[in-house]
A protein has these predicted regions:
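Conserved ABC transporter NBD signature motif
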Residues: 102-111
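Pre-Walker A (P-loop) beta-loop-beta motif of ABC nucleotide-binding domains
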Residues: 67-78
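The feature captures the beta-strand-to-loop junction immediately N-terminal to the Walker
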Residues: 80-82
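ABC nucleotide-binding domain signature
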Residues: 78, 114-117, 122-131, 143, ...
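ABC ATPase nucleotide-binding domains
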Residues: 122, 137-272
Length: 395
């Protein structure tokens, strides 16, 4: 069960389970016994089907979502993608706030939840803005879920106190949300979601509302709590660092479909779309390999150290690019292209140079190097990359 949207301002009352946080404005209502779906798994199937097995199909106007997820208990999966890719729609369909369309399915620990209302699902949700009840203390916010499950008030408050203690918030149990910092509010929201002992934990951009310093501390704590969580966790984010640090596996969604999935290291090492390449900071190209030479689909050839054949991707980091104002002589780099500066911007402690020309690419230079080269928009340059700094892999 999840927590309800506090926008109604109504006092919580015991019941069978709350609606999902961020869902329709409603007070908890008793869960209906909808019975199993016709295709509910047998006991034997259920015993061997622990975790999440879902195909999330949602048709909404011109947008079509079709995402398949399979997650084992104890694993954390991050849904990563640009704005409008369908990440939040997928999360809401898992919570039951957005109904699945024809062809969709949702099983949790072998039990079909397709037709189960949100308040009856064993799901905890933490949304981006947390949605804590403003009129309740931190303690009562966390106790709300257990109370709606029928736990006696004293026991529910004791459980809530234990969760707040685990979150390092024991001293803030009596504080109302307006007295909490962003990081404290995030931890209260997480405690509220975990207090109902969910079999599926959903987190929608859980760190997005925090400043950089607070995010650093809260991210470390969230990683610890997720490592201790024994059920399934699904995290939605557009921040690659959050995804890399918090998740065991990444599922990248673009235009409503999965374009790549794998471990964080595999995704970072082998991006397969421009979005992912930009996310992990790589120049990415597609072409056809003939030995150590890759002839790009659009552009020149690139020399690599890998010996491959057929369709491939080639990637290299912006830091692997060396720029010259004049054509270099005596360089050991096997790749040389004539380019033009399209733009410059500060990128951390370096200057990111966007280049057009024979090969569009990004290059990272120190501020001193950029000044010595006298770079400006429209300046002609030569770009070189050593073959040893490229990475080619099958498409």
């Amino acid at each position: 069960m999840t927590g309800v949207n506090p926008a109604t301002g109504k006092n919580p009352a015991p019941g069978n389970g709350p609606a999902a946080e961020g869902g329709p404005d409603q007070t908890p209502s008793p869960a209906k016994d909808t019975g199993p779906d016709e295709d509910t798994a047998s006991d034997e199937d259920t015993a061997s089907a622990q975790g999440l097995d879902a195909r999330l199909v949602v048709d909404r106007g011109d947008f079509h979502l079709d995402v398949t997820l399979s997650v084992a208990p104890g694993d954390v999966v991050a849904l990563l993608g640009p704005n409008g890719a369908g990440k939040t729609t997928a999360l809401r369909s898992l919570a039951g706030l957005t109904p699945l369309s024809r062809g969709g399915r949702l099983r949790l620990d072998g039990v079909a939840l397709d037709r189960t209302p949100p308040e009856s699902r064993p799901v905890g949700v933490v949304f981006q803005d947390y949605l804590l009840f403003p009129h309740l203390t931190a303690l009562d916010n966390v106790a709300f879920g257990p109370r709606c499950q029928g736990v006696p008030k004293a026991e529910a408050r004791a459980q809530a106190a234990d969760w707040l203690d685990r979150m390092g918030l024991a001293d803030h149990a009596g504080a109302k949300p307006r007295r909490l910092s962003g990081g404290q509010a995030q931890r209260v929201a997480l405690a509220r979601a975990l207090a109902i002992r969910p079999r599926l934990l959903l987190l929608d951009e859980p760190l997005a509302a925090l400043d950089a310093r607070t995010r650093l501390d809260v991210r470390a704590g969230l990683r610890r709590h997720l490592a201790e969580f024994e059920a399934v966790a699904v995290l939605v984010t557009h921040d690659p660092l959050d995804a890399m640090v918090l998740a065991d596996r990444l599922v990248v969604v673009e235009h409503g479909r999965v374009v790549q999935e794998g471990s964080p290291s595999d995704i970072a090492r082998h991006p397969r779309t421009d979005y992912i390449a930009q996310l992990v900071g790589l120049n990415l190209y597609r072409g056809t390999a003939e030995g150590h030479t890759v002839r790009l689909d659009t552009g020149p050839a690139i020399t690599t150290t890998e010996e491959l054949s057929g369709p491939v991707f080639v990637a290299f980091p912006p830091g692997a690019v060396t720029l010259y104002r004049d054509r270099p002589t005596g360089s050991s780099a096997r790749n040389l292209w004539r380019c033009e500066v399209a733009g410059l911007e500060t990128h951390g402690d370096q200057i990111r140079v966007d280049l057009t020309g024979e090969l569009p690419l990004a290059a990272d230079l120190t501020t001193v190097a950029a000044a010595e080269l006298g770079l400006h928009t429209g300046a002609p340059v030569w770009a070189t990359v050593k073959a040893t700094q490229t990475h080619a892999y099958p498409a």
